[in-house]
Design a protein with these regions (language model features):
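Non-heme Fe(II)/2-oxoglutarate
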Residues: 14-98, 119
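Catalytic core of non-heme Fe(II) oxygenases with the double-stranded beta-helix
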Residues: 112-190, 224
Length: 247
């Protein structure tokens, strides 16, 4: 629980505000060698090939729906994957997980390339538990399109819909009534967040710049050994495929 500030009326403290049930989005900066960075960008452009966007008009090119979702199996990206996986482990510990009681798996890893005026619509990742994005471009200005994280609930607006604005009584972007949080990309910036959170990417507003990032989806299961708790999926090594009954 975070105590934000006390309320005052005529100079007398009347109450204390408690921010409850926080949602944690973590950020950190990774150091990427400039030569490695240039090589990664060249590789990702080659993987994109002649396709400059997804089938939906105005949408950025995303590797997960274009057959490029296993960057974690490419040797070139192994150092980056290792660094991001370390940070993902740190995220779990930061929000109270006992790492000895869970196993963390990297499920998907794909690039997102956004040319001018391309965006990624609001979505979440229902097949993952923890997601991360590592930016390979950006100067922190947000001109190339910010990552927007959408609030799952708006309890403090009290009257449903008021926080949307349109001349309503709630102050715009008040910290206790915000419906979104924006993060501007910059080289080496890593962001981690619960996969269930809705998020989007605003349009790239710089006609001279390519916005490039790598996305990671992690899944949490029980450890390989021992009895798994009923609320946590057993380790994949304990799974068995069912026979194909379609033929």
């Amino acid at each position: 629980m975070l105590v934000l500030w006390a309320g005052f009326f005529n100079g007398v403290m009347t109450f204390t505000l408690h921010q409850l049930f926080p949602t944690v989005v973590a950020t950190t900066k990774l150091v990427i060698d400039p030569l490695d960075l240039a090589g990664h960008l060249q590789t990702l452009l080659a993987l994109r090939g002649g396709t400059v966007g997804n089938p939906s008009e105005g949408c950025a090119w995303t590797g997960d729906i274009n057959g490029v979702w296993q960057l974690h199996h490419q040797a070139e990206f192994a150092p980056l994957v290792h660094k991001v996986s370390e940070q993902a482990t740190g995220y779990l510990e930061s929000v109270g997980f006992d790492r000895s009681q869970v196993a963390l798996h990297l499920q998907r890893c794909w690039p997102v390339l956004s040319d001018w005026d391309q965006l990624v619509g609001r979505h979440h990742h229902p097949n993952a538990h923890l997601s991360a994005v590592l930016y390979l471009t950006g100067d922190g200005s947000g001109e190339e399109g910010v990552l927007r994280v959408h609030a799952p609930h708006q309890s403090n607006e009290l009257v449903p819909g008021l926080v949307a604005g349109h001349g309503g009584p709630i102050s715009s972007d008040h910290p206790l009534n915000s419906e979104r949080w924006d993060l501007a990309p910059e080289v080496g910036l890593l962001v981690l967040f619960p996969s269930r959170l809705d998020h989007s990417v605003l349009a790239n507003g710089d006609p001279e710049s390519l916005r490039c990032s790598i996305s990671f989806d992690f899944v949490i299961t029980a450890p390989e050994h021992g009895n798994p708790p009923e609320y946590l999926a057993p380790h994949p090594s304990q799974w068995s495929p069912c026979p194909d009954l379609s033929s």
